[in-house]
Amino acid sequence: MLIFPLINDTSRKIIHIDMDAFFAAVEVRDNPKLKGHPVIIGSDPRLTGGRGVVSTCNYEARKFGVHSAMSSKEAYERCPQGIFISGNYEKYQAVGLQIREIFKRYTDLIEPMSIDEAYLDVTENKLGIKSAVKIAKLIQHDIWNELQLTASAGVSYNKFLAKIASDYEKPHGLTVILPEEAEAFLAPMDIAKFHGVGNKSVEKLHEMGVYTGADLLKIPEMTLIDKFGRFGFDLYRKARGISNSPVKSNRIRKSIGKERTYAKLLYSEEDIKKELTLLAQKVENSLIKHDKKGRTIVLKIRYADFSTLTKRKSLNLATRDKKQIERTAHEIYDSLEEQPRGIRLLGLTVTGFE
């Protein structure tokens, strides 16, 4: 028996556009000598004493196992021939605005998720084109023809499936998921690839024996709600390709943060501050990607006994600079009373966007 009725609106035409290795692709475009070489956007660990985090990298670097959010030190160990570029984020933002203008030729119902990806609702569009697939192809063509960059596109009847579709074939892919194909498309998929299902939820699902979309289909709705609360309702529908969330052109993000749970508890100040430095870099990357600056830095600490402490500090000027975020996080930590307890989680968030 269903707790909530299944309502599946299959009339919409949603496109998800995701630029391919965006920052790195812009650098290769602007410097053809980089073509064919592994390019890593992030500080060179040979110049920073091993500090820093990879913002993104091109597909040549990914062949060596390099990926975003990896430490620059590990990226260098995996790919010593990689070319490290600190990045020109003002340039990336300018190109992102050019891409946004291309989207606007087709629809005003655009929900940017970051500087390099967005949802578009083209059910009703400016050119009166009935085929969302045709519009997706036109957008890909425009981006390549005008900016010499590639984008992957996913087309479906909701945002959840469009996002999954755009990730399915990269780079420069175009994947379509029709209503009658949704369950079959999702069935063999690793549950960790379901958009919106985080690591903690994946762990819980694995404990339940759920590893794929097909496994999730077998779980009763009430069981999922008992285990996950309201999110169980969403999981039950995701497995069936149901998601009626609208494309919100006025979507407002109020904060950006990163956190990490540690299998081995942190005790030493050196280890704790090292982790805060890495988190600051990741937060900066995310702020740049979303073109945000904030005035308030929030430090979150969860101790071994699962008690949680949250403390914040406001700045005079909004920032997205990793050094400012790192310095403020260290200041907040230093202001705390000495705690002999081990730390199992650290989090850094920037809010108070200008």
Curated annotation (Swiss-Prot):
Similarity section: Belongs to the DNA polymerase type-Y family.
Cofactor: Mg(2+)
Major location (coarse): cytoplasm
Gene: dinB
Residues marked Substrate discrimination (site): 23
Keywords: Cytoplasm, DNA damage, DNA repair, DNA replication, DNA-binding, DNA-directed DNA polymerase, Magnesium, Metal-binding, Mutator protein, Nucleotidyltransferase, Transferase
Record's protein name: DNA polymerase IV
Stated role: Poorly processive, error-prone DNA polymerase involved in untargeted mutagenesis. Copies undamaged DNA at stalled replication forks, which arise in vivo from mismatched or misaligned primer ends. These misaligned primers can be extended by PolIV. Exhibits no 3'-5' exonuclease (proofreading) activity. May be involved in translesional synthesis, in conjunction with the beta clamp from PolIII.
Catalytic activity from the UniProt record: DNA(n) + a 2'-deoxyribonucleoside 5'-triphosphate = DNA(n+1) + diphosphate
Disulfide bonding pattern of the chain: none
